C-alpha cells in the first residue's frame, strides 16, 4: 500500500497538530491544507511555533509561493476557500480529508468535501449524525462503505477505552464522569459575551468554569452496552493543555482496587498498548504534554470506597493524543478499503 494522502480543512489547534503527526509518519503524506482565514506565510509561522508543543524541528518549512508550502522538499498545496464543496482536493491528490474547522460537523456539511474529490472525511469533533469511532474501542465496526466518520471528542477518547476495560472485566452498572479540562480556543481571555453559555463567557485564565460535556453520553454510542449508564460534566480550568478524567462507577463484579489496577495495566501492555497508559509515579498535568496515548490511568490517584464502588483517574493530552488518534483512525480506514 502506498502512502495515505491526506488534506486538512481548518488549520487551528487540531489541524496544525494533525499536520505535525502526519509529517512524522512514514505511511501518511500531507498533500493539502485549506484555511480561508490565514495567509500562507502566517500558516508557516503558526505551524512552526507552538506555545505548548514547542518549535517544529523535524524538517525545514518554507514558502514556495502563495499556494505552496515546502516541508523539507515536499510540496503541500495551500487553499484559501470558504465553501468546502469548492475545495479541489482531488487536484492535490488528497483522498482523506480531516475536517477540523469545528463548523462542518454533521454528515451533510462534511459531505461537501466529497464533491471536490475527497474519498473519505474524518470530522475531528463529535457529530450529531456521523458514525463515531474511537480507536481501541469500536474501530472494528467501521466498514469501507462509510465515507464520513467522526473521531468523537478528546474526552470520549480518554473515557471510552477506560470504560471498556472496566466493563469487559467487571461490568459497569452506572457511572458519573467529571473532566477537569484545559482551556480551549472557544473560551474567552477576559469576560465577554456568550449568550448560550453564560459561565463559558467568563475569563478562562482566571476561573474554574463548570461546563457541560457530551463525552460520557457519547461513550454509549461507541459502546452500546453502556448506553444510558454514563453521564458527566466538565470543569474548565486555567491550564493550556492536558486534561484529566475522573470516572466514578458502580461495578457488578466485586473487585479490589488492586484487581482493577491489574486489569488496566494488563490492557495497557496488551491489546490497548499505545491507547491506554498506566502510571504509578507521582505525576502532574504537565508531565503528560506530548503524550500520544488516549488515556493514561493514574494508579495512585484513584480510590475505592468498597469492592463495588470506585473512582478512577486518567490523564490525556487533549491536543496531541487526540491528533494522533485522528491519524490512527485514517490508517484503520485505509486498511479496511
From Swiss-Prot:
Active site feature: 154 (nucleophile)
Post-translational events: Phosphorylated after gibberellin treatment.
Biological process according to GO: glucose metabolic process; glycolytic process
Site (Activates thiol group during catalysis): 181
Known EC number: 1.2.1.12
Pathway(s) of this molecule: Carbohydrate degradation; glycolysis; pyruvate from D-glyceraldehyde 3-phosphate: step 1/5
Principal location listed in the UniProt entry: cytoplasm
Known partners and oligomeric status: Homotetramer.
Family assignment from sequence similarity: Belongs to the glyceraldehyde-3-phosphate dehydrogenase family.
Name of the protein: Glyceraldehyde-3-phosphate dehydrogenase 1, cytosolic
Recorded name of the encoding gene: GAPC1
Amino acid at each position: 500500500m502506498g502512502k495515505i494522502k491526506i488534506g486538512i480543512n481548518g488549520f487551528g489547534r487540531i489541524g496544525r497538530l494533525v499536520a505535525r503527526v502526519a509529517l512524522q509518519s512514514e505511511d501518511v503524506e500531507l498533500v493539502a491544507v485549506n484555511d480561508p482565514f490565514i495567509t500562507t506565510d502566517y500558516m508557516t509561522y503558526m505551524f512552526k511555533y507552538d506555545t505548548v508543543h514547542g518549535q517544529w524541528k523535524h524538517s525545514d518549512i518554507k514558502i514556495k509561493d502563495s499556494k505552496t508550502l515546502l516541508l523539507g522538499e515536499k510540496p503541500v498545496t495551500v487553499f484559501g476557500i470558504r465553501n468546502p464543496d469548492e475545495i479541489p482536493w482531488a487536484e492535490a491528490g488528497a483522498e482523506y480529508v480531516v475536517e477540523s474547522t469545528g463548523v462542518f460537523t454533521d454528515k451533510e456539511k462534511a459531505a461537501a468535501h466529497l464533491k471536490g474529490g475527497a474519498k473519505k472525511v474524518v470530522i475531528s469533533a463529535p457529530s450529531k449524525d456521523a458514525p463515531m469511532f474511537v480507536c481501541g474501542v469500536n474501530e472494528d465496526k467501521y466498514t469501507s462503505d462509510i465515507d464520513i466518520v467522526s473521531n468523537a471528542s478528546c474526552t470520549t477518547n480518554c473515557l471510552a477505552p477506560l470504560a471498556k476495560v472496566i466493563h469487559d472485566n467487571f461490568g459497569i452498572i452506572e457511572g458519573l464522569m467529571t473532566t477537569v479540562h484545559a482551556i480551549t480556543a472557544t473560551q474567552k481571555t477576559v469576560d465577554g459575551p456568550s449568550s448560550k453559555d453564560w459561565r463559558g463567557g467568563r475569563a478562562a485564565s482566571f476561573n474554574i468554569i463548570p461546563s457541560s460535556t457530551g463525552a460520557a453520553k457519547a461513550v454509549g454510542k461507541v459502546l452500546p452496552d453502556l448506553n444510558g449508564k454514563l453521564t458527566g460534566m466538565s470543569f474548565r480550568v486555567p491550564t493550556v493543555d492536558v486534561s484529566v478524567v475522573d470516572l466514578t462507577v458502580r461495578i457488578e463484579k466485586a473487585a479490589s482496587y488492586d484487581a482493577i489496577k491489574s486489569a488496566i495495566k494488563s490492557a495497557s501492555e496488551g491489546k490497548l498498548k499505545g491507547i491506554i497508559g498506566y502510571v504509578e509515579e507521582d505525576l502532574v498535568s504537565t508531565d503528560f504534554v506530548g503524550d500520544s496515548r488516549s488515556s493514561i490511568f493514574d494508579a495512585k490517584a484513584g480510590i475505592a470506597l468498597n469492592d463495588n464502588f470506585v473512582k478512577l483517574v486518567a490523564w490525556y493530552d487533549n491536543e496531541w493524543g487526540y491528533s494522533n488518534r485522528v491519524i490512527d483512525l485514517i490508517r484503520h480506514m485505509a486498511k479496511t478499503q
